[in-house]
Design a protein with these regions (language model features):
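Catalytic domains of cell-wall/extracellular-matrix polysaccharide-remodeling enzymes
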Residues: 140-218
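C-terminal motif of bacterial Sec signal peptides marking the signal peptidase cleavage site
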Residues: 15-18
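Substrate-binding cleft of extracellular glycoside hydrolase catalytic domains
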Residues: 50-66, 83-169, 175-177
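Functionally critical loop-and-helix segments that line ligand-binding/catalytic clefts
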Residues: 24-57, 199-261
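Extracellular/periplasmic catalytic domains that process cell-envelope and extracellular macromolecules
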Residues: 49-52, 73-76, 104, 134-137, ...
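Bacterial N-terminal signal peptides that target proteins for export
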Residues: 1-9
Length: 261
């Protein structure tokens, strides 16, 4: 996405993601198919229930195995984030199957990269670009940044200034190659340690499974909210991460049109 277009899109998302449950109903919406999802361990979000949102999506990796994407589409899924790469030497073995079949089912999709702080930003950007063709990027690519304490090879936690510098280099490389400004995915602790008040001109996809993001992420406007890791989605075997877009269907169509250029 061109830098000149970003302020327009961000102003729209700042409006919709800052809405209360009362003002959300005032947004202009169109009729959409009601999602047919369940959750094996649902969280009570009160009036901020994610099901109040119009646009729902999932994220997948090799751990989800084979997916019936036609059934996923019929269940009410509008978008999918698909794991592509990790570090500077790993590709998700299901990536190509997932994005090609999601595309065939007319589901908008974006690849994501799981960042390791044990190799350089350039090495990881090179690896992502080498393995992710431009046709696999219908929505902006995603940089997934979170601490990884269970990793057998990389538990490194650089200082915040180092983290942000590496992120910026990686983001710049991807934006230059794909022509779309990447989305940033993050977790509560990583955001607290490194990202509060930073990267305000990027769209954020946030993990918040215990409370609404406005209660967890300090001063952060979000575009996507991952609200559960225990979802049940027709067409996907086993627990599934489910997400919502912050605005209405009209906002979604506008965002996709702009972000996909």
């Amino acid at each position: 996405m061109g830098r000149r277009l970003l302020p327009v899109v961000l102003s729209t998302l700042m409006l919709v993601s800052g809405c209360t449950s009362a003002s959300y109903d005032l947004l202009e919406t169109a009729s959409v198919a009601k999602p047919r999802f369940q959750d094996t361990d649902p969280q009570d979000f009160g009036v901020n229930n994610p099901h109040r949102h119009d646009i729902h999506g999932i994220d997948v990796s090799k751990w989800n195995g084979d997916v019936d994407w036609q059934q996923v589409r019929k269940s009410g899924v509008s978008f999918v984030f698909i794991k592509a790469t990790e570090g500077s030497d790993r590709i998700d073995p299901k990536f190509n199957d997932h994005w090609r079949l999601a595309a065939k089912a007319d589901i908008l999709h974006a690849p994501y990269h799981f960042y390791y702080f044990c190799s350089t930003a350039d090495a990881q950007a090179d690896w992502f670009i080498q393995n992710v063709p431009k046709e696999a990027v219908t929505l902006p690519p995603v940089l997934d940044v979170e601490w990884n304490p269970s990793s057998p090879t990389c538990k490194t936690r650089p200082a915040p200034m180092v983290v942000r510098a590496e992120m910026q280099r990686f983001l710049d490389r991807l934006e230059k190659h794909y022509g779309k400004r990447p989305i940033i995915y993050t977790s509560v602790d990583f955001h607290r340690d490194n990202l509060v008040g930073q990267f305000k001109d990027y769209h954020f996809w946030v993990r918040s499974v215990a409370a609404h993001p406005t209660k967890i992420y300090e001063d952060r406007r979000w575009a996507f909210w991952q609200y559960t890791a225990t979802g049940v989605v027709p067409g996907v075997t086993g627990p599934t991460d489910i997400n919502v877009f912050s605005g209405s269907e009209k906002n979604w169509k506008s965002w996709v049109t702009t972000a996909s250029k």
